[in-house]
């Protein structure tokens, strides 16, 4: 994409209660509030997720990719699709070779544990009536998040029901469909075309994403931009 992004600190007024980072079309916000309380070994995974090839790249392609797709699809955001892609890119970093040290690998694994724990915590809070303290204890015991991070995260889950579920559910779908595509297409599978097919949809519900990937496999896994005009 032609668009570029910059990395900025989270504004001081909201930083104490904000998440660790948030990617977008023009910028990636990284939370620098109380840095001693934040483990830096997660920065590689966080950058992949929020910036490139995660949210900033996805948002740029949503506005620039060719195709006869309604404009609202470029500006809408389905969390399962967007956060699923973001979490998938953390895993994709292994293939890309960007995790240089054992600490960075540990950071990615820590993030994976965190997203899996959300499935339990969100359900506990909003279906089984868990207390804030019980949710904090579960996250504390099952992840490597700092005390400051887990406190702000639990408050986020309380105030935004089900959003935290979308990360792992979306990533599980993308990785499952990739595995199916690799098995079905064999040597014809090209992960570049697989990724282009996902990102070219802009933002869609997970059911639509699954249908689109099934259709792509049935068509033989082609380059979705093979006939696109060069601009």
Predicted regions and their residues:
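Long, His/Glu/Asp-enriched segments that create or flank divalent metal/ion-associated functional microenvironments
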Residues: 1-231
